[in-house]
């Protein structure tokens, strides 16, 4: 996860504890020397607190880029400076990462209990399905220009019936409908933390629809074992 690295393009939001760009480049080189493929994960859509740190007066930075200014968490897709800002950062990320095969865009958990989404009138008018699709496709097209594929978390694109643990694509917004329109070479990283399930309908559905998929486990008892066994059968 690389959004907190001290990129030149994001100098306005650096944190004192962030990794230096030099250290990141050295880490990538170490990985390459040891036959490890680097897949940088740069948080987008939700989980964008990196974009809104507080200044010395305790005020949030970049509030024009926040969807909900009362709780800056997701970004405002209608702000014309958003994507140039992201693109400049990603250009740096992929160069420092040795021009990787994949870019992980995160893109999960856009709904936060403390933040409204969408909050801005112009984005409410667009509708969440269009916002989600257009944003994914911006990264898809960016990656294609740089001979990469994108990888993303899957929760917004599966229903609660498909994943009782984290499926956020059901009513009222029905975001799972968006996956019908998405290119089938987007790798879905199916994150599942619960150790109790032995069957994963979300993974079956995504695989049946043709998406490459990676099972992303956590550390709860039986989670790794159950998810691995299921994915091996797919």
Q: What is each model feature region?
A:
Residues 162, 170-227:
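Glycoside hydrolase catalytic-domain groove-lining segments
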Residues 1-186:
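Aromatic-lined carbohydrate-binding surfaces of glycoside hydrolases
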């Amino acid at each position: 996860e690389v959004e907190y690295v001290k990129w030149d393009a994001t100098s306005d939001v650096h944190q004192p504890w962030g990794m230096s760009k030099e250290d990141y480049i050295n880490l990538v080189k170490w990985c390459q020397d040891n036959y490890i493929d680097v897949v940088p994960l740069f948080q987008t859509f939700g989980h964008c607190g990196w974009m809104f740190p507080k200044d010395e007066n305790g005020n949030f930075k970049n509030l024009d880029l926040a969807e909900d200014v009362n709780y800056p968490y997701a970004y405002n897709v209608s702000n014309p400076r958003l994507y140039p800002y992201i693109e400049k950062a990603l250009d740096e990320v992929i160069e420092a990462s040795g021009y990787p095969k994949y870019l992980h865009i995160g893109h999960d958990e856009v709904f936060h209990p403390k933040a409204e989404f969408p909050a801005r009138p112009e984005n409410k008018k667009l509708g969440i399905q269009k916002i989600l699709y257009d944003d994914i496709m911006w990264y898809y097209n960016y990656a294609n220009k740089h001979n990469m594929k994108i990888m993303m978390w899957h929760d917004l694109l599966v229903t609660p019936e498909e994943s009782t643990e984290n499926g956020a694509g059901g009513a009222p917004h029905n975001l799972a409908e968006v996956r019908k329109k998405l290119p089938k070479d987007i790798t879905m990283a199916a994150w599942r933390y619960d150790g109790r399930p032995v069957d994963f309908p979300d993974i079956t559905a995504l695989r049946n629809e043709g998406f490459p998929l990676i099972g992303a486990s956590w550390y709860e008892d039986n989670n790794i074992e159950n998810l691995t066994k299921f994915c091996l059968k797919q």
